[in-house]
Amino acid sequence: MPYRMDRRAYAETYGPTVGDRIRLADTELFIEVEQDFTSYGDEVKFGGGKVIRDGMGQSPIANADGAVDLVITNALILDWWGIVKADIGIKDGKIFKIGKAGNPYIQDNVDIIIGPGTEALAGEGMILTAGGIDAHIHFICPQQIEVAIASGITTMIGGGTGPATGTNATTCTPGPWNIYRMLQAADAFPVNLGFLGKGNASKPQGLVEQVAAGAMGLKLHEDWGTTPAAIDTCLSVAATYDVQVAIHTDTLNEAGFVEDTIAAFKNRVIHTYHTEGAGGGHAPDIIKVCGQANVLPSSTNPTRPYTLNTLDEHLDMLMVCHHLDPAIAEDVAFAESRIRRETIAAEDILHDLGAFSMISSDSQAMGRVGEVIIRTWQTSHKMKVQRGILNPQGNEQKADNFRAKRYVAKYTINPAIAHGIAQYVGSVEEGKLADLCLWHPAFFGVKPEIVIKGGMIAWSQMGDANASIPTPQPVYMRPMFGSFAGARHATSLTFVSQAALENEIPSQLGLQKAAVAVSGTRQLSKRDMKLNDALPHIEVDPETYQVRADGELLICEPATVLPMAQRYFLF
């Protein structure tokens, strides 16, 4: 006789199933399970008296004959493509299969084989996401990487050489020698890393040598002079070598206005950093570019979301980051020109409309490296509270599935696509590197339970190492075995240009991590940004700074209280 479980008992045992809803942290966001790949009555679960035992849910099949290295059981996947309950099989550091795990000798519909060589990780009641991608990193100090991975970030893209004045302000690793040294330093860390060369030059040779040395892209920054000539040259070199260009435009409008910069793009694809403008860019109307089909717009997290504190903290941040002097009136005027409540408020709504495609940090250079994921979901929550259910399909779903998928894409798949690495990372899809985060729903977006890097646990919540069990206080994120020695080399990637691989730069430098080439960056458009491809016509009033999208005024109130904040942190 089959045994019938009530829905609550089932969820407590195997996790939620189709139709169940889950609250994300302490936000007003609720997601609903759309599909369940597991088979009722045939679920696998590890533990004493449970299913994954020899002759039951575990088969005698060797790994060489098809058993996986790691199975995550009964997890709820939240990704841009869906919200589904499934087992996840990981083999050779990659996602092998999303489906039903077990023993094919005694269970039906098994496509993930559990054998004696299979490790088990309980995903019951947990949310599984792709590791985050932060595509706006100032590599000012290596300690950023520890903070980032502890928050759920597994890929970091940007530039810098340490706390040099240039790096403090601009995301560039300038010149072959500096690029070589940073590529060598990348071997020390359990995350995927890629470096952007300096793109500011009106002649190509200085840019070509940086791409050939291993830069995975180029960065144009106003502090180095983002003139129309430099933009044109940089994009021309990028087109030749198939790398992405990121840009921080000319706040002071010295070399031209936003229209001149758009003209210099010549319809070529480009990633615009902090597209609202508080982080830098044509004042007051750089935000217009988010309506251009060739522009891939991102935000940095200090303006995410708009709160009653946002404006006040930005002025001090800006003075420090851009080497400005509060005693010089012109420097103060420069700073004040970038901070506008109207465009920051509009940025919230443009994210909710899918017109802004990505969110990143701007680490230690007007951004917090450990808060990309938190700020993304705080923005989503604020928009739910202020704008209601986001339901463009017009169906009757009461949950926030569409909004959740739109927002998770902003720090996972979309930056991966933008920088030519989506074939490797950026989503929970078969064949990709198993860079994954497991979250307790109550801590979703705030503190991951486990960060898996290339199929191995790299960071995890862990209690007192001298305790008799893993859970006694103090419990906090700590590096695990995947973060050490050769394991970090085997489970992480370094992203470089195809030209660098052809020049055998990785072997010349003795790199231990696998170096892989970015590709497909120059054929992109805004339409390639998953669930974030809207192209509204943006107008900015030059006197009031009011923003309109397709004629509609974009205005919202600042948040006075946010979830995912003091409830979770002592400091």
Swiss-Prot record:
Residue sites binding Ni(2+) 2 per the record: 219, 248, 274
Listed HAMAP family: Urease_alpha
Comment on bound cofactor: Binds 2 nickel ions per subunit.
Main subcellular location of this protein, as a coarse class: cytoplasm
EC number(s) stated in the UniProt entry for this protein: 3.5.1.5
Family classification: Belongs to the metallo-dependent hydrolases superfamily. Urease alpha subunit family.
Name of protein: Urease subunit alpha
Leader sequence residues: none
Keywords: Cytoplasm, Hydrolase, Metal-binding, Nickel
Lineage: Bacteria, Bacillati, Cyanobacteriota, Cyanophyceae, Nostocales
Catalytic activity: urea + 2 H2O + H(+) = hydrogencarbonate + 2 NH4(+)
Cofactor(s) demanded: Ni cation
CDD domains the UniProt entry points to: Urease_alpha
InterPro entries: Amidohydro-rel (IPR006680), Metal-dep_hydrolase_composite (IPR011059), Metal_Hydrolase (IPR032466), Urease_alpha_N_dom (IPR011612), Urease_alpha_subunit (IPR050112), Urease_AS (IPR017950), Urease_asu (IPR005848), Urease_asu_c (IPR017951)
